[in-house]
């Protein structure tokens, strides 16, 4: 068993203000996406400008935060929301959903695409390779916060998390997700998109591989206590939400290869 590196989840405290590592990880994710976007924009043959990248990151940040919070409440805390709707705005208490954040980003990118007269999927194809930076950083934030741990296990790298009331040796599933949803997914998408691919393909690859990785990790991740298993004694909410991503992702890749259309330059309205 490996000792859990008990890091204070509060990185900096200035008087009554506390800056949590989880919040810093969000900033790292947005900053990393911005830098990668600027790098790719210079090599886009005029399809993307620095202004477009800056605006896209801003729109995306709004989508992630608003969608992530609303999704968490609807997917994981709906009964509590019905009893007390004010929990929706209590962001400081924690609780964000990837799937809600994804829907929020898609909605935000719809408005961004309209502003710049771009095809929505051209926008998501450009941005998709940068998303794993934020996903990986977020999972490190989960690990530092000692939350979203895995199931009990006897593997040699198991850890006991200080916030676990049962104090059992568990899979460090946050690190598995960091490795798969962060590092592996970034490498796959970054190298796949090095050369311009047909429309839909990069977005499809993101949905396909994220869905696969999330479904796999859910087998060793402790399900949310307020939900438990959805069916069969093993199907989790995360797997149920990720399965459509795999199906849609595969469909987008096939559609992209069949249509074989490519993004076109555009200007703001």
Curated annotation (Swiss-Prot):
Matches recorded under NCBIfam families: lgt
Membrane topology: Multi-pass membrane protein
Pathway linked to the protein: Protein modification; lipoprotein biosynthesis (diacylglyceryl transfer)
Known EC number: 2.5.1.145
Enzyme class: transferase
GO cellular component: plasma membrane
Gene it is expressed from: lgt
Amino acids binding a 1,2-diacyl-sn-glycero-3-phospho-(1'-sn-glycerol): 139
Listed GO MF terms: phosphatidylglycerol-prolipoprotein diacylglyceryl transferase activity
Entry annotated with the keyword Signal: no
Pfam families: LGT
TM regions (residue ranges): 10-30, 56-76, 91-111, 126-146, 172-192, 200-220, 237-257
Role according to the record: Catalyzes the transfer of the diacylglyceryl group from phosphatidylglycerol to the sulfhydryl group of the N-terminal cysteine of a prolipoprotein, the first step in the formation of mature lipoproteins.
Subcellular location(s) per record: Cell inner membrane
Membership in a protein family: Belongs to the Lgt family.
Protein name listed in UniProt: Phosphatidylglycerol--prolipoprotein diacylglyceryl transferase
Biological process according to GO: lipoprotein biosynthetic process
Keyword annotations: Cell inner membrane, Cell membrane, Membrane, Transferase, Transmembrane, Transmembrane helix
InterPro entries named among the record's database cross-references: Lgt (IPR001640)
Organism: Marinomonas sp. (strain MWYL1)
């Amino acid at each position: 068993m490996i000792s859990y590196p008990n890091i204070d989840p509060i990185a900096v405290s200035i008087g009554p203000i506390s800056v949590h590592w989880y919040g810093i990880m969000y900033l790292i994710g947005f900053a990393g996406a911005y830098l990668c976007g600027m790098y790719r924009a210079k090599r886009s043959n005029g399809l993307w400008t620095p202004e477009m990248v800056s605006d896209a990151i801003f729109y995306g940040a709004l989508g992630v935060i608003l969608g992530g919070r609303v999704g968490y409440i609807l997917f994981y805390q709906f009964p509590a929301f019905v009893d007390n709707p004010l929990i929706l705005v209590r962001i400081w208490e924690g609780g964000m959903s990837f799937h809600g954040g994804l829907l929020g980003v898609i909605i935000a990118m719809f408005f961004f695409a309209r502003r710049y007269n771009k095809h929505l999927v051209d926008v998501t194809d450009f941005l998709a390779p940068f998303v794993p930076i934020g996903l990986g950083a977020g999972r490190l934030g989960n690990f530092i916060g000692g939350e979203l741990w895995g199931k009990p296990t006897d593997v040699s790298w198991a850890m006991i998390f200080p916030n676990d009331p049962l104090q059992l040796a568990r899979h460090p599933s946050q690190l598995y997700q960091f490795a798969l949803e962060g590092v592996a997914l970034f490498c796959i998408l970054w190298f796949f998109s090095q050369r311009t691919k047909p429309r839909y393909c990069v977005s499809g690859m993101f949905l396909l591989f994220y869905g696969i990785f999330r479904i796999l990790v859910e087998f060793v991740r402790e399900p949310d206590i307020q939900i438990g298993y959805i069916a069969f004694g093993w199907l989790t909410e995360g797997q149920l939400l990720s399965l459509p991503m795999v199906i849609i992702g595969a469909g987008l890749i096939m559609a992209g290869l069949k249509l074989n259309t490519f993004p076109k330059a555009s200007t703001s309205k």
